[in-house]
From Swiss-Prot:
It is an enzyme of class 3 (hydrolase). This is Alpha-fibrinogenase albofibrase. Disulfide bonds join C31-C163, C50-C66, C98-C256, C142-C210, C174-C189, C200-C225. Glycans are attached at N44. Its EC number is 3.4.21.-. GO terms for cellular component: extracellular region; secretory granule. Residues 1-18 form the signal peptide. Pfam families: Trypsin. It is found in: Secreted. Residues 25-249 form the Peptidase S1 domain. Its main location: secreted.
Amino acid sequence: MVLIRVLANLLILQLSYAQKSSELVVGGDECNINEHHSLVAIFNSTGFFCSGTLINQEWVVTAAHCDSKNFKMKFGAHSKKLLNEDEQIRNPKEKFICPNKKSNEILDKDIMLIKLDSPVSNSAHIAPLSLPSSPPSVGSVCRIMGWGSTTPIEVTYPDVPYCANINLLDDAECKPGYPELLPEYRTLCAGIVQGGKDTCGGDSGGPLICNEKLHGIVSYGGHPCGQSHKPGIYTNVFDYNDWIQSIIAGNTDATCLS
């Protein structure tokens, strides 16, 4: 069984996954309050349901399947109960999804750019993360973080994001667990082969950080999370660099690689 790593607040899907909206990274530890400056909490009236990454003062990147109505974004957040003095909240001004995305295939081009209604200011807990200038190397140690599940099945509701280190794996190590994956989906495979560390429900849209660059976006994975030979699937940000830069530059008709 596979899991899109977001809580969709809709009808049956809401009933199926509702308990996972506030869960955290499986197999990780509480993030240091000073290590997730670019992490964005995406929330609505029901709470946090996705994450994103600040890539400059006006733009956030997240997963396309995190698109929803009436959401807001919180920057500089750590604890849900204790506010940081420099937390900032913004609304989306514009949202961009690849125009050539296959709407019936969630894994296809699972990336969304969000322009904020006003820029955020850099602060002690807010700073953008750079995009990659080259593809990541297999074997790289990468960092995951988010407000998603700390347990693969049972529900836990910690108040802070969790972080973990995982490895970037060769596609051949992913294919047996995900025969539905196609090359044109432009994804990365990352995790621990023997299992135990993984992103999970509620982590969708969050970052896969390798060499201090945003290399991946949490998209998809096995259920229960953290299974052996079922690592997480991440949108490969490097393959979308040209599209991202075109949109930011004002070419809103730009298309993504097929």
